[in-house]
């Protein structure tokens, strides 16, 4: 599930949007969260990304925290729960507004300024693609580090 508070995290945990999110999520079994690690598969499920902007660009992205006893594979935490798919993503960059288009295919909301804003919108689309690829395919990208060993085992 993706929670987008659309507030750019300006107010932090005490903002009305954050309090509303806490109230909505209270009955859910939300796992412990952490800011998205730089090595998380969501950063490379299709596009290689370091930022995850929407209409806003500075809100942190939160995902399920790796278990403290997570195995290390190639120096990176190996998330073996849910095939490596985080069950929850939380941010406040207003991705839906960045992705929204009208019946003529024109952007409905401004993003950034000038060409920098259009680049921000493009990266926002890329984040959306990465998110969907991550949801649909799990951790297949992290499995790629094991391909040489698998081919060796198969005698290839």
Residue ranges and their predicted role:
Residues 1-68:
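A glycine-rich, often tryptophan-bearing local segment used as a flexible ligand/cofactor-contacting loop or short
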Residues 13-16, 100-102, 146:
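Short, solvent-exposed loop/turn and secondary-structure capping segments
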Residues 15, 19, 83, 122-129:
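A structural signal for well-ordered alpha-helical segments within the folded catalytic domains
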Residues 26-27, 79-84, 125:
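Extracellular/periplasmic catalytic domains that process cell-envelope and extracellular macromolecules
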Residues 63, 69-81, 85-88, 102:
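Short, surface-exposed beta-strand/loop micro-motifs that present aromatic residues
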Residues 92-94:
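Short beta-strand-plus-loop segments that form exposed binding edges in beta-rich domains
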Residues 96-100, 141:
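Short, solvent-exposed loop/turn elements at domain surfaces
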Residues 104-156:
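Extracellular ligand-binding/catalytic regions of CAZymes and related secreted enzymes
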């Amino acid at each position: 599930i993706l929670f987008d508070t659309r507030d750019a995290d300006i107010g932090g945990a005490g903002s009305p949007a954050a309090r509303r999110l806490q109230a909505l999520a209270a009955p859910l079994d939300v796992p412990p969260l952490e800011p998205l690690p730089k090595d998380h598969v969501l950063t490379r499920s299709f596009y290689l990304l370091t930022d995850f902007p929407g209409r806003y660009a500075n809100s942190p992205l939160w995902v399920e925290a790796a278990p403290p006893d997570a195995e290390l594979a190639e120096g990176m935490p190996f998330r073996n729960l849910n095939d490596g798919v985080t069950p929850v993503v939380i941010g406040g960059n207003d991705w839906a507004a960045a992705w929204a288009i009208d019946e003529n295919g024109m952007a409905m909301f401004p993003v950034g300024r000038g060409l920098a804003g259009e680049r921000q919108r493009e990266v926002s689309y890329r984040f959306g693609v990465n998110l969907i690829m991550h949801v649909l395919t799990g951790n297949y990208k992290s499995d790629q580090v094991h391909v040489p060993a698998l081919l060796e085992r198969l005698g290839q």
